[in-house]
Curated annotation (Swiss-Prot):
Domain of life assignment: Bacteria
Keyword Kinase included in the entry's annotation: no
Protein name stated in the entry: Putative nickel insertion protein
InterPro entries, per database record: Ni_insertion
Similarity comment: Belongs to the LarC family.
UniProt keywords, alphabetically: Nickel
Pfam families: Ni_insertion
């Protein structure tokens, strides 16, 4: 399967993703034709070449003309998407992105999802950005999207709800469970739309070994003083397998600490903190320590870039006086998220492949749990519906 690797050098926003896709070779005319099926009048795509810190890339501006609604409700936006002529898989992806934004906004503002009204995200340009990203992936043949952890920016930003810290609460809500990097340029480097694209479409973490085929640069609107405001997108294929057709080993770190005086609540928090710091996995297992004391083996798996942060999280959240570490090699299957439409809403299915051959498909638990809570049904019912929807579209 082809890879689409995203590097948010200056951040990520919906227009930057569109621009990077066009710079990779997506036909803007084909993109516009598909988006016209949304039936939303008064906009056009302005595509220009632009240099940023000496890097030539593509800049996209969604030019809005005439009177437009000040905001739109989630139901209104989902109805637009459902009635559109977007390709089926792009329609599913767009629906999933908007639903994820709605859930994040509802949690941040303490209102039911049905009462969420989008201001910035409900504007025509954001609707075009989200649906355009889904159509662009369709035109690229739905490569597996992998993204490097983004820097979120710093400072304050003005929104329709008032002045908020950077990153805004909705951005952090959308990126829960994803590795991110604090700091960055003085401003909003990751927009809610950009965060939603990462949350729904991408696996965020260390980029895999690969063979670059084409490279595109999406240039943003703002100018950062210390870096080019670009999103780099690389269309690639996995690096040649080392051995029996797998993707080849990667070197990771196992971090461990033995605990015999740490309350169970803190152990649970330490696992959570390790994952927030960028650990690929974290766990706790019972063990018997010296003098027959019952204890806990706390462990985490991470890459070199996150080793210091994960170690710091283990020290900060537990009573341990030391953290052991040793390098390990891991071979992992190729993985990609594919959104499917169910009667409960859009759910991502994680698909595992080896050398292009599918070995398994598993509905994403967090998506299923959110849909189950909203519908008042058991999680396993949503999981079964998602798996059935995924299998129904296979040849």
């Amino acid at each position: 399967m082809a890879l689409l690797l995203l590097e948010p050098v200056g951040g990520i926003a919906g227009d930057m993703f569109l621009a990077a896709a066009i710079d990779l070779g997506v036909d803007p005319a084909a993109l516009a034709r598909a988006l016209e099926s949304l039936g939303v009048p008064g906009w056009r795509l302005a595509v220009t070449r632009k240099a940023e810190h000496g890097i030539q890339g593509t800049h996209v501006d969604v030019v809005v003309e005439g009177e437009q609604p000040a905001s739109r409700g989630l139901a209104e936006i989902l109805a637009l998407v459902a009635a559109s002529g977007l390709p089926p898989r792009a329609r599913e992806a767009a629906r999933g992105i908007f639903e994820r934004i709605g859930e994040a906004e509802a949690r941040v503002h303490g209102v039911p999802v049905s009462e969420v009204h989008f201001h910035e995200v409900g504007a025509v340009d954001s609707i075009v950005d989200v649906c355009g990203a889904a159509v662009a992936l369709d035109l690229l043949g739905w490569p597996e999207v992998r993204a490097a952890p983004p820097e979120l920016g710093r400072g304050l930003v003005r929104t329709a709800h008032g002045t908020m810290p950077v990153p805004p609460p909705a951005v952090l809500e959308l990126l829960k469970g994803k590795p991110v990097r604090p700091g960055g340029p003085p401003g909003e480097a990751v927009t809610p739309t950009g965060a939603a694209l990462l949350a729904v479409l991408a696996e965020v973490g260390p980029l895999p070994a690969h063979v670059p085929l084409r490279v595109g640069y999406g240039v943003g609107t703002r100018a950062w003083p210390d870096r080019p405001n670009v999103l780099r997108a690389t269309l690639a294929e996995p690096a040649p397998a080392a051995g029996a057709g797998g993707p080849g080993p990667e070197t990771l770190w196992v971090l461990e600490a033995n605990l015999d005086d740490c309350p169970g609540q803190l152990v649970a928090r330490a696992i959570e903190a390790a994952l927030e710091a960028g650990a690929l996995d974290a766990w706790a297992a019972p063990l018997t320590m010296k003098k027959g004391r019952p204890g806990v083996l706390l462990g985490a798996l991470c890459d070199e870039a996150r080793r210091a942060a994960v170690t710091g999280a283990l020290f900060a959240e537990t009573t341990t006086l030391g953290v052991r570490r040793h390098a390990v090699e891991r071979e992992a299957l190729e993985r990609a998220f594919e959104p499917v439409e169910t009667g409960y809403g859009t759910v991502r299915v994680k698909v595992a492949r080896l050398g292009g051959r599918e070995l398994g498909a598993h509905p994403e638990y967090d998506d299923c749990a959110a849909r189950a809570r909203a519908a008042g049904v058991a999680v396993r019912e949503v999981m079964a519906a998602a798996l059935a929807a995924y299998r129904s579209r296979r040849p």
